[in-house]
Amino acid sequence: MGFLERIRPVLNRPEFYELFHRILGADRRSRILINEYMKPKEGDRILDVGCGPGNFVPYLPECRYLGIDANSAYIDTARGRYGTYGKQFICDTVSYQSVHDLGEFDLVLAIGLLHHLEDDEAHDLFRMGHNALRAGGRMVTVDGCYVPGQSPVARYLLSRDRGQFVRTKEAYLNLASRCFEEIHPSLRDDLLRIPHTTLILECVR
């Protein structure tokens, strides 16, 4: 068993998850994603699906934020840090009905989530995101991506990711286009301190 396989279970613990991401340069990555792609506005209603321990919360403007994650340890950490600041966190899996009952959002985030989902599950996520958005709202996804001419190191690291469904740009777009007509894709290879290709999709309802 290689190093990456050995650390996968450890990353389910919030403290190690955050340490690992800090080492990779997650702070700079978060700022870039928020300022250049998510672009939240003060007063926005934001749904963060697979929010983890709430790492994006400190970078957001004053907003109505709801984070959902199935990992209870992540949610406990997020509530302890940010629950007193008017941010809500729910420990649950996400379904169309559960999100439908929450009302409309200006922004739906799914950061590092699609590559953990099979195609049918990913389609359900896009469908859920589309239906959770108000008219003109946006769903932003961020995931590792295979591209032609990719460095062998980047391709290898993606192949060893905890998520077993890293896709090509075309495959991600095919899933998103079943629910969204307007999609703005962006490829970045400069967001982390390791060789890594990231695909950002901005999907507009």
Regions found by a protein language model. Give the residues of each.
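Helix-to-beta-strand junctions that scaffold the AdoMet/dcAdoMet cofactor pocket
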Residues: 118, 133-134
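Glycine-centered, small-residue-biased loops immediately flanking beta-strands
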Residues: 137
